[in-house]
Regions:
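N-terminal transmembrane-helix/juxtamembrane module of multi-pass inner/ER membrane proteins
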Residues: 1-48, 81-109
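Membrane-helix interface segments
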Residues: 28-31, 60-65, 135-141
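Transmembrane-embedded, aromatic-rich helix segments that form part
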Residues: 47-50, 165
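Interfacial segments of alpha-helical transmembrane regions
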Residues: 54-78
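Membrane-water interface at transmembrane helix exits
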Residues: 55, 79-87, 132
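Short helix-capping/hinge motifs at transmembrane helix termini and TM-loop junctions
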Residues: 58-59, 87, 158-161
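Membrane-embedded catalytic cores of phosphoryl/pyrophosphoryl-handling enzymes
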Residues: 102-174
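Positively charged, low-complexity/disordered segments
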Residues: 176-178
Length: 178
């Protein structure tokens, strides 16, 4: 059973990366600069930390800022521990794989830590969910697109497997005071 699960996961990761490579080949001149900008914004969670700190300045957004900062702190610790515990190599690590050639085509964005879970996606999920739970419910569901877009960029550049991104979303832990 365990081998079946691993084979299914690897097949899913490969199929989704293959699809991303097709997107790159067909729409890369349009998509790549936009997605590169988005993924750079997510480096070290910097944009999410800055926005959370800005939210602290205003009474109306202070709750969202506090929730987001706490979630981001928990996320950094959890992601760091999980990356070491799982020790999954990046998709491009095996130079004889499709992933490696796709990574080169996508611009060979360099990443040095382990792959699972996606730290960018975890931070984006923490930030998006923090805003979701602390804002007007009528429109707050739009904040949930933040992790989807960030996760998409990480798979597009072949720096993460699809399952790394899913892990980043699922790993999210919220202090969620309501």
């Amino acid at each position: 059973m365990n081998n079946f699960i691993i084979a299914t996961q690897l097949s899913l990761d490969h199929d989704i990366a293959s699809f991303m490579n097709k997107l790159l080949n067909n729409f890369g001149s349009f998509l790549t600069p936009i997605l590169k900008f988005i993924t750079i914004l997510g480096n070290f969670g910097t944009i999410f930390i800055i926005l959370s700190l800005l939210f602290l300045l205003f009474t109306k957004t202070r709750k969202a800022g506090i929730i987001a900062l706490i979630a981001l702190l928990i996320g950094v610790i959890t992601v760091s521990i999980t990356k070491i515990a799982v020790s999954r190599d990046r998709p491009f690590f095996d130079t004889n794989s499709d992933f490696y050639s796709w990574w080169l085509q996508a611009g060979a964005v360099k990443e040095s830590s382990y792959s699972f879970p996606s730290g960018h996606t975890t931070a984006a999920t923490e930030f998006g969910v923090a805003l979701f739970i602390s804002k007007n419910k009528k429109y707050s569901w739009l904040f949930l697109f933040i992790p989807l877009i960030m996760g998409f960029t990480r798979i597009y550049f072949i720096v993460h497997y699809f399952t790394d991104v899913c892990g980043g979303c699922l790993l999210y832990t919220s202090p969620s005071p309501r």
